[in-house]
Amino acid sequence: MPRRRVSMGAYTDYSPALMTDMYEYTMLDACLKDGTADRKCVFEVFTRHLPEGRRYGVVAGTGRILDALEHFHLSEGDLKFLSDRKVVSPETIKWLENFRFSGTIKGYREGEMFFPNSPILQVEGTFGECTLLETLILSVLNYDSAVASAASRMVSAAKDRPCMDMGGRRTNEWAAVAAARAAVVGGFKGTANLLAAQIYGLKAIGTAAHCFTLVHDDERQAFRSQIAALGENTTLLVDTYNIEEAVKTAVEVAGPQLGGVRIDSGDLASLAQRVRNQLDALGATNTKITVTNDLDEYALAALQTAPVDSYGVGTMLVTGSGAPTCAMVYKLTEREGADGVMTPVAKKSKNKATVPGRKLAFRSYEYNLADCEHIISGSEKALAAYQPNPEWKNLLVDYVDHGTIDPQYQGHDAIMAAHEYRAKALAELPITAQSLMKGEPVIPTETTVL
Amino acid sequence: MPRRRVSMGAYTDYSPALMTDMYEYTMLDACLKDGTADRKCVFEVFTRHLPEGRRYGVVAGTGRILDALEHFHLSEGDLKFLSDRKVVSPETIKWLENFRFSGTIKGYREGEMFFPNSPILQVEGTFGECTLLETLILSVLNYDSAVASAASRMVSAAKDRPCMDMGGRRTNEWAAVAAARAAVVGGFKGTANLLAAQIYGLKAIGTAAHCFTLVHDDERQAFRSQIAALGENTTLLVDTYNIEEAVKTAVEVAGPQLGGVRIDSGDLASLAQRVRNQLDALGATNTKITVTNDLDEYALAALQTAPVDSYGVGTMLVTGSGAPTCAMVYKLTEREGADGVMTPVAKKSKNKATVPGRKLAFRSYEYNLADCEHIISGSEKALAAYQPNPEWKNLLVDYVDHGTIDPQYQGHDAIMAAHEYRAKALAELPITAQSLMKGEPVIPTETTVL
């Protein structure tokens, strides 16, 4: 697959610069007036907790943030809108005219595991430029990581059987594209979504719908038509009327070389067993069985002993299997004071207090298995002097250096690298991570304030 | 607000034509080869059940489908992609070159209540053109209606207090735009999302974030700055450090004309009560109190007696408050046979069987309250001869007539009309609809097959 540079068409007419909450612009306006907009700042993205009972999360979406950053500038239409609605003052409009993010971004890799308080993304720049990114960064990371985290659990539950994204119809049409990408980061092997396949170079997969059988005069004609168009290696949908008859017809029409059959209703385990035996008896021993129908990780685990070859997962994938968002937040942790010195800051809101200071993040291992997430916080000076254990894994990579994006984290190759990385990082966690039993995060997070 | 025609920039480079599952195109390919692609068809969108315990759903998104239809044609890039990936044959590429939907669409209004089996959308055209729309139509209706349905419950629970969408950061960045629109259909009064405000002409609202207080040397300077930029009618965030001190500072800085304060943490009801008393004691009797912090319809109901003036709702709005999708499906119900006669069809899949034949839909009333949803199904001829009770409300309106879109259902005015319509339609349901207790749909759906 050739490496594809992504240029989100969505951002051509509507830039991501207005994919934001109004208060980001009104705060910018006030801070430009009083001079604090130029203060150097560090913002960090983290979540206070994983969804109930989850053992780990999987980071996804960072590459999409980089794509969006490339287009994060205001069009004439955007400026006119902000001006007409009096969202900001004319002076701020002027400031926004040539806006480009010129800061630095570090963070966890896509496909990396995360835990409560992991500093998933760290954005450093002036207050003005960092605050404008808040909503967009959170939208991307909260949704994509929710999908990747659910996908990863499903892939574990499916053991070595491939999982395919078929969930586009059950979420917003653009979320569907992001979900397909995040599913692959989370371990899925392909997607039914053509736009995701086009934009990100993903493998596209598909079978047929019940309407295809119904529009034909009978099932035999439908199967004949599909094989004529797609070849005998196609997958025929066999549960429109009567599964046993459909399987018989399918093998009669395609011959024993038939690629596969799909079952989309009923008791999937016992139906798969019956269909497998029937296919074998008909000589179609290499014909694959794929099943679909509101699958989640628990259903996949229950199907482990059934003779199924692959899974199509829809609703529960794109809605994060009960956790459709990650509760990630974007918080100011350090800023320049009136004296020009960088100072750790934190809010003290009840149950929502934050840890002041920028963070370093490492993972330690014992017998090749992760045993702790170490978050080190402190002043710029203290962190510069800090010597981590050399055997720890440094979890922060450099995404953007003073406005320059590292392209290795964008496009198709980055997604496939994240796909591989997830499998490796998951294998390095205690095996309890792969349990579907509800429990605590599989490793503790220790925060050290220097 | 001037009426805005919507031209989704997202569709300029990436047309909605690839926001679809691959099998729609492979089915088209097979059907073009065997001649069934030209068969006249009727597809219908419905859900088999509401989310557990919900009394009704609210339709939203149909106007966005019309926007997408205007752009539903394949660019050269799209055709090249389908060709390079060998998704379809060269003959099908040719057919797709000038593709425009030329069929007819009827359906429920946006803002209308729906129940199990309500035919929310009815798409009539050739098999080829109708099948290509499946995924996109479902993506839009499933997500937008999930948000509008949750919004409607929240608005009921909030009584007359305005609810504002602040959820953009907790869902995909484009889903956020759709969610803001759907929230207004569902009864919300405004959104923090600027792009939604721009595209759909919605009211934009906002306060300030904790980082705004933190970037300043102290809270007093932050409040001064915000008032200098936005005037004393602005809303100050008072829970960064200590709420009581912040309220005192706020009134000192702004004077008793201060527009509002926002509380985002802790026990909102008791804090609102304390803050109200403090504000009144300081003479700021007209200063409003807005609260935020993972609100859902249950939290809003619990706040009914607290002195709160408005609500900012985030996560639970954009994730459908536990039901992030509506389980709507798009099923072939009638098609032309080899003999040219329209014939009702249905699949017989276990637990997923469908009712054959196109549907009419009416709601009947007793003492001005809805008492039944009537779904009438049958052959084209039987339906043409059918005489409904003249007192029933006909639930299907004409959206598209042979490819021509009725513009009254697009843009800002259509959203505001849907907003009004929802309030009226909800008031016509038995009051149990507004209960948050789990239960059955508030009126039964009766299906009659002629």
PLM features per residue range, with description:
Chain A
Residues 2-39, 52-54, 282, 287, ...:
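Gly/Ser/Thr/Ala-enriched C-terminal appendages of enzymes
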